Amino acid sequence: MAESHGGGGGCCPPMDLMRSEPMQLVQVIVPMESAHLTVSYLGDLGLVQFKDLNSEKSPFQRTYAAQIKRCGEMARKIRFFKEQMSKAGVTPKETLDRENDIDLDDVEVKLEELEAELVEINANNDKLQRSYNELVEYKLVLEKAGEFFASAHRSATAQQSEIETEQVGEDLLEAPLLQEEKSVDPTKQVKLGFLTGLVPREKSMVFERILFRATRGNIFIRQSVIEESVVDPNSGEKAEKNVFVVFYSGERAKSKILKICEAFGANRYPFSEDLGKQAQMMTEVSGRLSELKTTIGAGLDQRNILLETIGDKFEQWNLKIRKEKAIYHTLNMLSLDVTKKCLVGEGWSPVFAATEIQDALHRAAVDSNSQVGSIFQVLRTKEMPPTFFRTNKFTTAFQEIVDAYGVAKYQEANPSVFTIVTFPFLFAVMFGDWGHGICLLLATMYLILREKKLSSQKLGDIMEMAFGGRYVIFMMSLFSIYTGLIYNEFFSIPYPLFASSAYDCRDVSCSEATTIGLIKTRDTYPFGVDPVWHGTRSELPFLNSLKMKMSILIGVAQMNLGIIMSFFNAKFFKSAVNIWFQFVPQMIFLNCLFGYLSVLIIIKWCTGSQADLYHVMIYMFLSPMDDLGENQLFPNQKIVQLTFLFLALVSVPWMLLPKPFILKKQHEARHQGLSYAQLDETDESLQVETNGGGHGHEEFEFSEIFVHQLIHTIEFVLGAVSNTASYLRLWALSLAHSELSSVFYEKVLLMAWGFNNVFIWIVGILVFIFATVGVLLVMETLSAFLHALRLHWVEYQNKFYEGDGYKFAPFTFTLVGNEDE
């Protein structure tokens, strides 16, 4: 069994999320005849992460390589069917049949038959479609070239009388070469020929130029543009083409023209100069096209019927093949015993799953009619187990936020327990407007109420992220409403929701009022900021002071929580060294400086003192012996400050020096075989510091340990200052959000409302809505989210969280149907 690192008993909250599930390394010995069914049942259970016991073997050397190859071939056929169905617009049908009722051998035979039939149908359809496309081109050649020859014939008839009366006539461009052939002496006649076809339009000019140069101008070419694009018989793609007719003299010229046509992808078709034969060919081609169209339609109908038949069982077959492939992949991770009659497997599983695993093994043995049952046993190991948290749809997103930084080490304190509350709260501190919070809440409620429907749909990347984090956004919106009520801002407008303002103005111009110009006539405003501050000259200084001090208080509280979590870790892992020489000095250092500052802030709020806290903190270091004067907030403050300063200084060497020497002493005692009862209780940290992972015989490098501790100490001391300052981003982003909201309200909405024009009102409202949604509800939300993420990952988690574990990844069929091949 994986070694228990302590009970954690009373020191840790009894939460499922606080510690990862206790894990154990289990071994199963399965007879060969029941191995397949056993792995299948364990995949249905989904609680075992198998270890690869054949890592030294290549995939082709493993026991079930042939079966995986077989499944891969069936998966290829499934992908082929899916591609064909997609092209034909056929949608696979969801099936309620159990995939276990199908036999893989039957599926293989059926897929092979269907593939052969579909390939044959496609081949016939492609052949018919090619013939159809060729006939379409041939018909266009007959039409366009026929027009050219008919025009030439009419021109020849009109010029016949002139040719007879004149012995020498000037060659005209319109006079056909064939007609001139008739007008010359037969004994001197040169044999003329012509070729017809189609050439891609983008190549037509180059085609003509190459022909002219290759024959040295001894050709005559005519081209006619085809208005509509045609499907090329060779490529099957649509293309714009021209019909051409080339006249030449001599076989040599013909040979050159044929080669050029082939090079340019020009399709040639036979053509007769006889008008009667042209008409006959046109009739034959048209009839053939009609027949082919009918035949192709029947072939497509036959293919669609076949694809619909495939679609009825497609999902069932696909799931079966994927499951079988996953099973054989897992079986390849098991090793054969020496008798080659059993398979031995090892893997991690939660302790609570032991009974369920044994039940699955027993059922597999019974269902496979195995004469020998499977053996289940727990192994002892010093390996680090995987980390497994049981989450639900609400907590999953928060756990993913933590895991994005690093997966928790086995049974390390889990930050997401408190992140569920602190993350949306810190976001809301920066996004405090209850109007904007209501908008976020409405958008999130849409996602939550329709989650069943949306979870089954294919969403875009952004929408999928928003849907996955819907409960995070839900919590963010609730806390935004809460902090918005504290800030008393509704789209930057204050409302006296809980009572009237406690103050009245001394004069008419309340916007010029300061605290001196206000008279308190009623009880203090019961909740949040008094609405009277809005619009006054002192609004910004007042809110700045409030939010800045509040940010420091929140930051110090969360950093203290982080250090307290390190105490839970040390207590759970029974590491007294980390408690006394890490937790205690860190708490002293942080609270003697910034905890003290937080107390001063609260005292100043309660007493109304005018003391300058900047002066108090700076001169606490620079001149600790000077009198505080008007900056004194309570009696004996100077003595308290000197005590805190002394404790803070002492805590630094306290963190740095003892731990490395104690670890060295423990290591020496362990190797000398001495018994140190107290030290035995304390340390598992030696293994952590030396990356031993539980191996007690690794070489101890004192210099490395000391340098590591030095770095850790410096990091904490400097981080205490920088991390506290980092929390001031809460104030900065809250101020920015408030000011932007105020600008959009005053400079857009109110300015538009000042015009007595309905069109300007509508434009102003639209601009205000788009600015609010685009800038405040999208960009500001993303900005505040990222800053809250930073505060948790760096300022909070670095106090205790190592995050160097690895996730529990069990063998399961749950997601097999959605996996891409």
From Swiss-Prot:
Pfam families: V_ATPase_I (PF01496). The keyword Acetylation applies. GO terms for cellular component: Golgi apparatus; mitochondrion; plant-type vacuole; plant-type vacuole membrane; vacuolar membrane; vacuolar proton-transporting V-type ATPase, V0 domain; vacuole. GO terms for molecular function: diphosphate hydrolysis-driven proton transmembrane transporter activity; proton-transporting ATPase activity, rotational mechanism. Residues 2-422, 492-549, 604-641, 779-821 are cytoplasmic. It is a multi-pass membrane protein. V-ATPase is a heteromultimeric enzyme composed of a peripheral catalytic V1 complex (components A to H) attached to an integral membrane V0 proton pore complex (components: a, c, c'', d and e). Belongs to the V-ATPase 116 kDa subunit family. This is V-type proton ATPase subunit a2. It comes from Arabidopsis thaliana (Mouse-ear cress). The lineage of its organism: Eukaryota, Viridiplantae, Streptophyta, Embryophyta, Tracheophyta.
